[in-house]
Amino acid sequence: MSEKRLTREVTLKLNYYKSKVDKEAGVYLGGVVDPKYIDELEFNIDDDYEFDMESEEFKKNGMYALEISGSNRALKELGKFLINIAMFKTEDDEYHEHIETIKNGNGQPSVNITVRKK
């Protein structure tokens, strides 16, 4: 039995700050508006594991696992933020945005995310 794939179209309003560029001075103002509801997101970074059939135990596989969790509205805002960055037109070859003080698994604000557009 195969799963049936469904398609759902969504409409987004993308929000940006007005750009101002002075290449000679290295000034690039403007960019993507910060996502809302950051306080409802958690990013957990931990060792990754895989199940070993012989020992019937989970063992570290040498990689890291990133778990992102949050409320529906926080995850939607994070997705919209990433699409905003992808769609943002800039002359800045090193354009990036920061999301700061995202909570980790213990609820403390300790994860800062930098998203770079290449």
For each feature predicted by the language model, list its residue ranges.
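Positively charged, low-complexity terminal tracts
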Residues: M1-K118
